[in-house]
Amino acid sequence: MSILTVKNLSHSFGGRQILKDVNFRLLKGEHIGLVGPNGEGKSTFLNLVTGKLEAEEGNIEWAKRVRIGYLDQHSIIGADMTVRDVLKSAFSYLFEVESELNDIYMKMGELSDQELDDIMLDAAELQELLETNDFYMIDSKIDEIAHNMGIKEWLDRPAFDLSGGQRSKILLAKLLLEKPDILLLDEPTNYLDEEHINWLRRYLQNYENAFILISHDISFLNSVINLIYHVENCEVNRYVGDYDEFLRLKELKQRQIEAAYKKQQQEIQELEDFVQRNKARVATRNMAMSRQKKLDKMEKIELVREKPKPEFYFETAPSTSRLIFETENLVIGYDKPISKPLNLRMERGDRIAIVGANGLGKTTLVNTILGNIKAISGSISFGQNLAIGYFKQEEHYDNNNTPIDEMWEKFPSWEQFKIRTALAKCSLTTVHIESQMKVLSGGEQAKVRLCKILNEKTNILMLDEPTNHLDPESKEELKRALKEYKGGIFLISHEKDFYTDIATEIWNMEDFSLL
């Protein structure tokens, strides 16, 4: 059974073609991974099929009465809702049924016997709907999912006051409670710690309905999907199997195209040579015209221009003193403490990975060390000659700056050619670097922020989830560059596959936190 059918879908943005003549079909029970480089249109595709964006051309048809659950990168939570309110909203349609049922009960005393018989049938149907959907177990369902997602202690807190990562976990929990006919998940693991990624992995492995998943976490992707749709060069192509099988088939397909292109180019050369040599001679003119017609009708094979590959290299400043920083009975938090007194020390050459569940204070610790947040108590002492490069987990762009503008603000003495070259080394095309930051994808924005740090002379890197939104190729290049970096590294990451080869020491925030 087809749940979603897409025919001849085309869409552009700001004069740039994103998707062209795309055809797509989703069948019941399919577990699809939607993959491709940053900025190629994966999130745009989901926004089009859900109606958040209106397609310029093409047809999108959903099966009747299908319920869609969509977790995107920019979901919004109401300002006055507690976490429990957000999770309860997953059952809003059942609360509407309950309200309708209560209205029926209120009317019963005013009805004739015949009207009462009719309305009792309606009431029985509504009551059955509530019981079938476990309406009277909603609170226990909320408690169960909150426990599994590690958010139980937040249930009565205002959702708007939580961090971006915490809110993402809440929205994911709400989506799973809704149990839609299809899940659309846009990078759901970005803000999940290892424990809850594993829980989500098991959940999706056993999920009976269909889902479409965008993820740059390849080990996670491979463990839950059975089909790949690859988005690149305005096309969406289908591959059966996991991500590793997709890479093998894609490479095989590319070699076949290149071989066919080479063969066709040779044929074209031979035909053109024949036409040139024989079109003027009366005896061979007809044969030359025949060859020319063949050339004119030939469907030319075009090799797709290869996208620029990322080339990351961190500029370095002279070495620091032996001590980088040391804390004495440091307590971090905002209005109240969230950590035990911390006595931490980082020295030259240390490469420290900060791990642990969301909401324990990893980002707060980094911001306190950097002086962006005042400590509750305790002190921090620093070494000499520190040149720190800081990568924030998220950045919001309210102005009309392009990537070129962002780089110029950081490096005002640079010529435009140098700026464009630096951005190109982060695999950003001319279209990307001339677009406004606020319209770029999360991955493209991350590459611009990374480009600033790459070209800043540093001897300490403080990186808060730098792999969020990065495509696999960029992630691997970043890992390589960090392994070669000569300075100290203070890295927050939830991706064990990423930080294991980089870190010389691992600090688990659960050992430090009061939460």
Task: Say what each PLM segment does.
Residues 249-301:
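Intracellular alpha-helical coupling/juxtamembrane segments of multi-pass membrane proteins
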Residues 1-259, 308, 317-515:
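ABC ATP-binding cassette signature C-motif
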Residues 312-314:
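Post-kinase regulatory C-tail/linker adjacent to protein kinase catalytic domains
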